[in-house]
C-alpha cells in the first residue's frame, strides 16, 4: 500500500463490498465474454426461480439446470445453444417477446446481466455436469403446481390474531385530572401514560391551536382576523365551534380527499410506456371530495366504489365511484388478446381492495400460501372470482331515455357510414397491397420469409419477426384468403394509429407512408370522405360519461386495431358463450377462474380446477355470507358478486374494516397510527400502541353510522390533540423517546401539496375554483424533456394554475417536482402511508423554485397593502399571516435589521446601475420579498406544530 494511503473499514463501508465485488465481476465477465454457468446461475436464481424453480413452475418451465432449460415449458425450449437471438429466455428478458420477464415487481435484468446471459448462450450454454441445481427461493413445496397443491387448513388458533377478532368495547378507564376524564379518547390515552409513568404536556396556546386545526382539516392558513377573533374569544365553546366551521367547509373534502386518493393509487394517466390520459378520472376525484364533504357513511362509500353499478338504486355518484377500478396503472394492450394483463389487473385490484379497505396484504398468495398470515393461495383465487366478471364500461350520466335516444341515433348514422367506409377500403386495397409488397421487399430476407409463411406453419422465430411487422395491421375481409400478402393491409384511418401504435413498429423503424392514388380514385375517395364527414355531423354530442365498470366477459370485447384471435381454439371452445355486455333477459355467466391461472398460456390455465368465488377463510367463522347479491332491477344484468364482497367488507361484523379506517384517520391527524402500519394489520404489521382505544373507536365509528366527521370531532376536541408540541420532560424522553404514547403533540411536516396550498394561501392568490377537469401546474420545459409520451399541457404561473393542489393533473410518468421532492407516494400501488424524508432538494426547491419566488413577492405586496407604510407593522403582519403569531422582540429586531440591510443593498445597486428613478417603494418591496421568502422557507411555516 502506498505511503499516506489507508483503508478505513468502518461499518458504513463494509456493507457495500459485496455489491462492489458483484458489479466488478459482472462488468468483467460481460466485457471478456468468458462466461460459465457459475456466472449465469446467480442471475437465474435472483430473477427467475421465484416463478420457475423448485417450488413453482409457471408455464411448466423450470430453469434450475441446463437440461430443464432445454426441455422448456408450454411454449417450447427456452434455450437454443449457440444462438441467443433464437432463444426464448433471451427474447423474454430483453422484451423482444412479450410478456417481458421477469414480471413485476421483480426488477428487470441489468445490462450487464443481459450481456452475461447472451454471451453464455452464444458460447454454447455450457454447464458443469457436476454442479447441483440451484436451490429455489423459499416457498411451500406443496405449491409447486395445482396438481400438487393442498390447501392449508385455517385453524382456530390462526383466527386468534388480534386483528381477526371482532373489536370488543371496553368502558374507558377512570383518570385524573377532570379535564382528561370527559372524552373517552383522553381516558384511554391518560391511563396508558399513567401506567408508563409519563407526564402529559400542557395545552397549546390558542394561536397554535387554530393554526393546527386549520392546517389539519382544510390544509389552509387561518387569516389574521380569524386568529385574532379566536384568541380573544373566551366563550367555552369557542374551540368546538371553530372545529364545526372547519368540518362544514368545502375545503375539508379537498384536504382529506387527497389522503384517500393515495389509498386507491389515484392518477390521471395509465402509466407504463404509453402513459395515456384517463380522460374522466377527475370525476372520481370530485366524487371522493363530495362524499367526504357530505359525510357519506363510510360503509356506503366502500360499497359504491366496489359495486356502485350493482346497487338496487344506483346514482350518478355510485356509478362514478366504480372508477375505483379504472384509476390504477394499466397498459395499452387489450386483455382479451393479452390475458396475462387480466391477471395483473386482478392482482392490482385485490392488492388495493384488501390493503386499502382491510389492511391485509393478499398479493403474496398469488404464487404461494402467505408466509405470515393465514391467507392461502386458494383464498387468493376465490377472492379473484368475486371480481372476475368486471369489464371496463363508460356509464352515461344522463336519464336512460336520453341515453337510449343518443345510442339509437348514433347507431343509425354509423350504419349509413359503414358502406361508405367499405367502398373507400375497396378503392384503397390495391394501392395498399402494392405498398405493402414494396415495403416487404425492403425488409431483411428472414423477415420476408416469416411474413410470406402461412401463420399456422411459422416457427416461433418467424412468429416473432412477423409480429414485429404485422402488429397494428388489419385484415381485409374481402381479400383472397389464400393469398397471405393480399389479406394483410395497412390500417387506413388515423384514429386506428392513435388507439394502437405497437412499440415494435417504433423499435424496428417500419414506417407507413401515405397512399398515392390515381386522380380518378383520389377524387372518388374524397367524395366519399366528404359524405362521411357530413353524416358524422349528425352524430349527437356524447352525453356526460364516466369511465367505470360493469359485469360482462372481457374475452368478447369488441375487436379493434391490433387484435388477434385466441391461439389454438375458438372462443366457443374455450367456453365463451355469452357476450361482452349482457342485455336484460340474457343469460350471463361470470368467466371461470382456474386455480393457478396467470394468462400466459390459456390451455395450461384451463387444466387447473375451477375455483368457486368466496371470502378469506380466516375471517369467515361459521356460515359464510352469500357470494352473490344481484341487483333487484330488470334493466341491468350483473352477477352481484362485487356487491356481495363489498357488503361483506362494509359489514359491522367484519373485524378489520372499521379498525383500519379509524386508524387511518388517527394516522392522518397525528402522523402515526395506533397501528403504525396502517396498510398491514397482519403478523408483519406492528401491534397497536393502544389496543383498547382502537377497538373503542372502531365500535363507536359503527355506532355513529360510520360517520368520519364524528371521529374527527372526537379526536380534535380531545386534550390529547390539544397538547403542546414543544413540551420537554427528561423522564418522558427516557421512557418514551419517540412519543409512541402521545405525551405531547407530534410535530410533522406538511405534504408537498399542502405546502403549495399554504404558500398560495399566504399570498392570498389561491384560486378556489372547485371540481372539474384538472389543471396542469407549470413545469419547466427542461423537466419535460424525456417525457414525450402522454399529455402535459405547457402552462405558466398565473391565476388559472393557482388552484388547490388536489385539482392538479397527476401523471404517473412525470411527477410534479414540488410534490415529488416532498415524498409524493408511488401512484402504482396503494399508499398506506407517506414517507417523511429530510433531504437537501426540499430546501433547494423552496429556495429556488420560480413559483415560490413569485409568491414571495406577492406576499410582500399583500403585506405592504394591508399594513401601510409602517415597516414594523408589515413584519408583524407577515408573521401573523404565515405562522399565526406575533414575532418576539428579538425576531422583530432582527427582521427589521435584515430588511433595512436589504434596502441598503438594493439602493446601492440602483445607484451603481444609474436607476435613479427607481422608486423607494420598489426597493422596500424587494427587501420585504426577501424576508417573505425566508418566512416561506422556515420550519415553522411548513410544519404542523
Task: Enumerate the language-model features and the residues they cover.
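Short, well-ordered beta-strand segments
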Residues: 119-124, 778
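Globin-like tetrapyrrole-binding proteins
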Residues: 931
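Bacterial N-terminal signal peptides
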Residues: 15-27
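Primarily short, surface-exposed interaction patches in extracytoplasmic proteins
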Residues: 176-251, 265-313, 374, 418-424, ...
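Primarily the internal scaffold of c-type cytochrome electron-transfer domains
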Residues: 61-68, 130, 136-171, 279-281, ...
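N-terminal secretory signal peptides that target proteins for export/translocation
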Residues: 1-11
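Solvent-exposed helix-loop boundary motif
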Residues: 28-118, 126-190, 207-212, 222-230, ...
Amino acid at each position: 500500500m502506498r505511503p499516506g494511503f489507508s483503508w478505513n473499514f468502518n461499518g458504513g463501508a463494509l456493507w457495500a463490498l459485496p455489491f462492489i465485488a458483484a458489479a466488478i465481476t459482472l462488468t468483467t465477465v460481460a466485457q471478456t465474454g468468458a462466461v460459465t454457468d457459475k456466472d449465469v446461475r446467480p442471475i437465474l436464481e435472483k430473477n427467475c426461480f421465484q416463478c420457475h424453480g423448485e417450488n413453482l413452475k409457471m408455464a411448466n418451465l423450470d430453469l434450475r439446470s441446463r437440461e430443464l432449460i432445454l426441455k422448456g415449458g408450454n411454449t417450447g425450449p427456452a434455450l437454443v445453444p449457440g444462438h441467443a437471438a433464437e432463444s426464448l429466455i433471451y427474447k423474454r428478458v430483453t422484451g423482444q417477446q412479450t410478456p417481458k420477464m421477469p414480471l413485476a415487481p421483480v426488477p428487470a435484468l441489468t445490462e450487464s446481466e443481459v450481456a452475461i446471459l447472451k454471451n453464455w448462450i452464444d458460447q454454447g450454454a455450457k454447464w458443469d455436469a457436476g454442479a447441483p441445481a440451484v436451490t429455489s427461493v423459499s416457498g411451500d413445496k406443496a405449491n409447486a403446481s395445482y396438481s400438487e397443491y393442498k390447501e392449508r387448513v385455517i385453524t382456530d388458533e390462526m383466527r386468534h390474531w388480534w386483528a381477526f377478532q371482532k373489536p370488543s368495547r371496553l368502558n374507558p378507564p377512570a383518570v385524573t385530572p377532570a379535564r382528561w376524564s370527559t372524552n373517552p379518547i383522553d381516558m384511554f390515552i391518560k391511563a396508558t401514560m399513567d401506567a408508563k409513568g409519563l407526564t402529559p404536556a400542557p395545552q397549546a396556546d390558542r394561536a397554535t391551536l387554530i393554526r393546527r386545526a386549520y392546517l389539519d382539516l382544510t390544509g389552509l392558513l387561518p387569516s389574521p382576523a380569524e386568529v385574532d377573533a379566536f384568541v380573544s374569544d373566551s366563550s367555552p365553546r369557542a374551540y368546538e365551534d371553530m372545529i364545526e366551521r372547519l368540518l362544514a367547509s368545502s375545503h375539508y373534502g379537498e384536504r382529506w380527499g387527497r389522503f384517500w386518493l393515495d389509498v386507491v393509487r389515484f392518477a390521471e394517466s395509465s402509466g407504463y410506456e404509453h402513459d395515456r390520459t384517463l380522460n374522466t378520472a377527475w370525476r372520481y376525484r370530485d366524487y371522493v371530495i363530495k362524499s367526504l364533504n357530505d359525510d357519506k357513511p363510510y360503509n356506503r362509500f366502500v360499497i359504491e366504489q366496489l359495486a356502485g353499478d350493482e346497487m338496487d338504486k344506483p346514482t350518478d355518484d355510485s356509478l362514478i365511484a366504480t372508477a375505483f377500478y379504472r384509476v390504477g396503472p394499466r397498459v395499452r394492450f387489450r386483455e382479451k388478446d393479452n390475458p396475462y394483463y387480466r391477471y395483473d389487473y386482478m392482482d392490482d385490484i385485490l392488492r388495493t381492495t384488501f390493503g386499502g379497505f382491510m389492511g391485509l396484504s393478499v398479493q403474496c398468495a398469488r404464487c404461494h400460501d402467505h408466509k405470515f398470515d393465514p391467507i392461502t393461495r386458494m383464498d387468493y383465487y376465490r377472492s379473484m372470482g368475486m371480481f372476475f366478471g368486471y369489464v371496463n364500461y363508460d356509464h352515461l350520466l344522463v336519464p336512460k331515455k336520453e341515453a337510449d335516444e343518443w345510442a339509437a341515433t348514433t347507431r343509425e348514422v354509423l350504419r349509413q357510414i359503414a358502406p361508405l367506409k367499405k367502398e373507400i377500403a375497396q378503392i384503397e386495397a390495391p394501392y395498399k397491397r402494392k405498398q405493402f409488397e414494396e415495403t416487404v421487399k425492403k425488409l431483411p430476407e428472414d423477415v420476408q420469409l416469416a411474413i410470406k409463411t402461412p401463420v399456422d406453419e411459422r416457427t416461433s422465430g418467424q412468429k416473432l419477426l412477423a409480429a414485429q411487422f404485422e402488429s397494428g395491421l388489419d385484415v381485409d375481409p374481402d381479400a383472397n384468403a389464400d393469398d397471405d400478402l393480399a389479406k394483410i393491409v395497412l390500417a387506413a384511418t388515423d384514429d386506428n394509429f392513435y388507439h394502437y401504435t405497437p412499440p415494435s413498429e417504433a423499435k424496428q423503424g417500419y414506417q407507413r407512408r401515405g397512399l398515392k392514388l390515381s386522380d380518378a380514385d383520389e377524387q372518388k375517395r374524397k367524395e366519399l370522405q366528404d359524405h362521411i364527414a357530413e353524416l358524422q355531423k349528425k352524430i349527437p354530442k356524447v352525453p356526460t360519461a364516466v369511465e367505470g365498470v360493469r359485469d360482462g366477459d372481457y374475452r368478447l370485447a369488441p375487436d379493434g386495431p391490433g387484435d388477434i384471435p385466441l391461439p389454438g381454439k375458438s372462443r366457443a371452445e374455450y367456453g365463451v358463450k355469452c357476450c361482452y355486455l349482457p342485455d336484460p333477459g340474457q343469460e350471463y355467466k361470470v368467466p371461470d377462474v382456474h386455480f393457478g391461472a396467470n394468462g400466459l398460456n390459456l390451455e395450461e390455465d384451463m387444466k387447473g380446477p375451477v375455483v368457486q368465488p368466496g371470502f378469506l377463510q380466516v375471517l369467515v367463522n361459521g356460515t359464510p355470507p352469500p357470494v352473490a347479491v344481484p341487483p333487484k332491477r330488470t334493466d341491468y344484468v350483473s352477477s352481484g358478486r362485487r356487491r356481495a364482497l363489498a357488503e361483506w367488507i362494509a359489514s359491522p361484523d367484519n373485524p378489520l374494516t372499521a379498525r383500519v379506517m379509524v386508524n387511518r384517520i388517527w394516522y392522518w391527524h397525528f402522523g402515526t397510527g395506533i397501528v403504525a402500519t396502517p396498510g398491514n394489520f397482519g403478523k408483519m404489521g406492528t401491534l397497536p400502541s393502544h389496543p383498547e382505544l382502537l377497538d373503542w373507536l372502531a365500535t363507536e365509528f359503527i355506532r355513529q353510522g360510520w360517520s368520519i366527521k364524528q371521529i374527527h370531532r372526537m379526536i380534535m376536541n380531545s386534550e390529547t390533540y390539544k397538547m403542546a408540541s414543544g413540551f420537554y420532560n427528561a423522564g418522558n424522553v427516557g421512557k418514551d423517546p419517540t412519543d409512541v404514547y402521545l405525551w405531547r403533540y407530534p410535530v410533522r411536516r406538511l405534504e408537498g401539496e399542502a405546502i403549495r396550498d399554504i404558500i398560495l394561501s399566504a399570498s392570498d392568490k389561491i384560486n378556489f375554483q372547485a371540481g372539474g377537469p384538472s389543471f396542469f401546474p407549470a413545469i419547466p420545459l427542461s423537466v419535460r424533456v424525456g417525457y414525450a409520451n402522454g399529455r402535459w399541457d405547457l402552462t405558466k404561473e398565473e391565476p388559472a394554475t393557482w388552484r388547490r393542489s388536489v385539482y392538479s393533473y397527476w401523471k404517473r410518468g412525470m411527477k410534479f417536482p414540488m410534490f415529488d421532492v416532498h415524498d409524493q407516494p408511488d401512484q402504482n400501488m396503494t399508499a398506506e402511508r407517506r414517507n417523511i424524508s429530510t433531504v437537501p432538494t426540499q430546501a433547494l426547491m423552496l429556495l429556488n423554485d420560480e413559483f415560490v419566488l413569485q409568491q414571495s413577492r406577492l406576499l410582500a405586496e399583500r403585506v405592504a397593502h394591508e399594513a401601510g407604510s409602517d415597516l414594523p407593522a408589515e413584519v408583524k403582519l407577515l408573521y401573523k399571516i404565515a405562522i399565526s403569531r406575533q414575532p418576539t422582540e428579538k425576531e422583530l429586531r432582527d427582521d427589521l435589521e435584515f430588511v433595512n440591510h436589504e434596502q441598503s443593498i438594493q439602493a446601492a445597486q440602483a445607484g451603481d446601475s444609474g436607476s435613479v428613478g427607481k422608486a423607494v417603494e420598489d426597493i422596500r418591496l424587494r427587501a420585504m420579498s426577501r424576508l417573505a421568502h425566508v418566512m416561506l422557507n422556515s420550519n415553522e411555516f411548513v410544519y404542523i406544530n
